[in-house]
């Protein structure tokens, strides 16, 4: 039963995953010590080229407020959808067992995007590639609006997973490229707080829409329109980011 599943999972985390993480971190730390001289010079040189923005400076940057709607979209919409997935399945006449049993497709999508989007960012930079990260979510929402066949649940979950993988990989790189590495911890802590708040607001907002008799398909198309608008905003915000960052670093 579910108790056995939770128990086995906790045991696996205790005796398998946590020791593996500690071993990998120790190995990484030893590797950094072995190459401390060369690594330090490279990091110090690259940091000195680009001035790092403080959190306060970021909050005074107009680009941040154009990027923010796209940043909160995965947390707000994703949490809302997962919270109401049984309602979604009922609205689409999908078996709840079939739908929830297909979550592995979501995991495959998330893992695939996490592993592939990083190299894309390395080649293209986050400023050029991140504006596309909401495209899978837009397609997933359109699927819910347009199709009823249960097989479309796999495409929907796969696209949601792709969006999540691209989000976690891309946004961290984006903040480093836009605002530098020195104050990245302070900047990330603010972003995480905002996205957590968005996650908390998503389910009740979607629940209110359901209670006001807005169909699941129409809710998803509303979310899709929001994501399209957020994508336009982030394109505008990042279009001149290279020159803006250079101007700031030179001042």
At which residue positions do the language-model features occur?
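Helix-to-loop junctions at the C-terminal end of transmembrane segments
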Residues: 113-125, 210-211
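Structural signature of the two symmetry-related core transmembrane helices
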Residues: 128-142
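A membrane-interface helix-boundary motif in multi-pass transporters
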Residues: 1-11, 208-226
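A late C-terminal transmembrane helix in Major Facilitator Superfamily
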Residues: 181-213
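Intracellular juxtamembrane helix-capping segments at the cytosolic ends
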Residues: 166-179
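Paired small-residue
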Residues: 151-159
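Helix-loop-helix hairpin linking two adjacent transmembrane segments in secondary transporters
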Residues: 1-29
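Extracytoplasmic gate region of multi-pass secondary transporters
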Residues: 56-114
